[in-house]
């Protein structure tokens, strides 16, 4: 597939239905993880225009006894580099191994404010062999931006990525 996206307007579901096979086309045959994560976030950011889209990858910590989430490929304003397990929305999604939709980040206990512009968030864990190995984090400057449609399609998108 050419490295171009066909950006469409329409309902959120229609946009995802158009984007999903395009992301699959970008990932097919590419084995480099960074390239695949980068193209995935670029495609999502280009289609939806969200404030921030990126991955945090579970890695060994140099100065902390446990693994932590380390910033991976992203698009948007500069971001927090490391997140400990159980901290913030990303760390909570990691611990719970489930997608978290946060309509208002100010009301999420322990929210880590990497950007004061962010108003709502969805975090989707990437699970392989029963373990969370990364999370996809998406932030919006609008309250209540994300719903179960986003959850359904973003979970499908992270399943496409080979780790």
Regions found by a protein language model. Give the residues of each.
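A short, aliphatic-rich beta-strand micro-motif
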Residues: 120-127
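Juxtadomain coupling helices with adjacent low-complexity linkers
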Residues: 2, 20, 24, 140-163
């Amino acid at each position: 597939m050419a490295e171009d996206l066909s950006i469409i307007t329409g309902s959120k579901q229609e946009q995802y239905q158009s984007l999903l096979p395009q992301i699959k086309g970008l990932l097919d045959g590419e084995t480099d993880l960074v390239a695949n994560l980068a193209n995935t976030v670029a495609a999502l950011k280009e289609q939806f225009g969200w404030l921030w889209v990126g991955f945090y990858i579970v890695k060994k910590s140099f100065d902390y006894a446990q693994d932590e989430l380390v910033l991976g490929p992203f698009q948007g304003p500069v971001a927090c580099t490391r997140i400990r397990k159980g901290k913030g929305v990303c760390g909570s999604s990691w611990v719970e191994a489930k997608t978290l939709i946060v309509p208002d980040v100010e009301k999420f206990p322990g929210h880590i404010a990497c950007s004061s512009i962010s108003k709502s968030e969805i975090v989707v864990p990437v699970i392989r062999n029963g373990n969370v190995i990364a999370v996809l984090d998406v932030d919006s400057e609008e309250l209540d931006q994300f719903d179960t449609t986003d959850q359904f399609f973003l979970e499908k998108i992270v399943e496409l990525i080979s780790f």
